A protein has these predicted regions:
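Carbohydrate-active catalytic/glycan-binding domains of CAZyme proteins
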Residues: 23-298
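Bacterial N-terminal signal peptides that target proteins for export
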Residues: 2-10
Length: 298
């Protein structure tokens, strides 16, 4: 009996320690969210316009003058995916840009935007799920810079095929790119100039599975730095046919070794392509596919 009590005590200590560690590396402000608005705050028009429907990851930047959103619109009558732009004072009520779609001749979806100096750089998927780079001085007129180039650690180009859902973070003078290949895993590359990239390693830094919620596909949407850790917000699917996706989070100290949140997914109900935006208190979480919903951290 004494031995059994000792084992129970040891297991209790282990689980308490594990729970405390999870609370430390996954603070509630980054993983616990409640709806700020119950219904979707931005959707496709539902009528035969260029943005009858929206899809994939859009991106939101919060600046001094308000919120700026880039999104992908499409219609059943046109296979090309187009870029839209909208603005908001509060991040909830959005106004579409009068000249949408912007850059109407280019296939643009799954966008990610960073600001470097006075210019904005957009990473986006083109036709065939390959990533290309664009630059703008005013957020609406974008100049194409061509496909980014990714090499393996041995200097050879990565194998032909998809390299999409680009996600970029700047760290100590370098840029780090997370990308997926047919949602089979998430790879990491680095660059000094945003166009030429070299893999940090040739294997994924975040794999799908083994848990059911991300068993059949993963893609990184955004990585932020918070109190000594990197937090990666990614979407995933538990279904082989990809019929439904969820929003999830993982943590890392070095961008290479990741620990998934034990209570993933943080948002279900087929709300995915999740991004984080700072708020007056805590953070907002926006899920961008296939309607935009907004959540507030607890």
């Amino acid at each position: 009996m004494k031995n059994q009590n000792s084992l129970r005590y040891i297991f209790a200590l282990f689980f308490l320690s594990f729970a405390a560690h999870c609370q430390y590396i996954f603070p509630d402000v980054l993983v616990k969210f409640k709806p700020l608005v119950q219904e979707a705050i931005f959707t496709g028009t539902g009528s035969p316009t260029w943005d009858e429907q929206i899809r994939e990851r859009g991106y939101i930047l919060k600046e001094k003058d308000g919120y700026h959103m880039w999104y992908t619109g499409y219609t059943k009558n046109d296979p090309v995916k187009h870029l839209g732009y909208a603005t908001s004072k509060d991040g909830i009520q959005w106004k579409r840009h009068a000249s949408n779609p912007i850059n109407p001749q280019q296939w643009i979806e799954d966008v990610f935007v960073i600001k470097k100096g006075s210019k904005y750089y957009m990473f986006a998927e083109g036709k065939g799920d390959t990533t290309h780079l664009l630059v703008s001085a005013n957020k609406t007129d974008w100049k194409a810079l061509g496909n980014i180039r990714i090499k393996k650690t041995n200097g050879q180009p990565i194998e032909k095929g998809a390299f999409g859902t680009p996600c970029v973070i700047a760290v100590k003078g370098l840029y780090y790119l997370f990308y997926e290949r047919d949602d089979l895993g998430i790879w990491l590359a680095k660059s000094k100039n945003l166009i030429d990239w070299v893999n940090v390693q040739d294997q994924p830094v975040l794999n799908k599975g083994p848990e059911p919620y991300d068993l059949y596909g993963v893609a990184m949407n955004q990585v932020i730095y918070y109190q000594g850790y990197y937090y990666g917000y990614y979407h995933a699917t538990a279904y082989k046919d990809w019929r439904e996706w969820s929003s999830n989070v993982a943590v890392s100290k070095d961008l290479i070794h990741w620990t998934k949140y034990p209570q993933n997914p943080i948002i279900g109900n087929n709300q995915s392509s999740n991004i984080i935006v700072p708020a007056q208190q805590g953070f907002r979480l926006y899920t961008m596919h296939s309607q935009v919903h907004v959540y507030q951290s607890n």
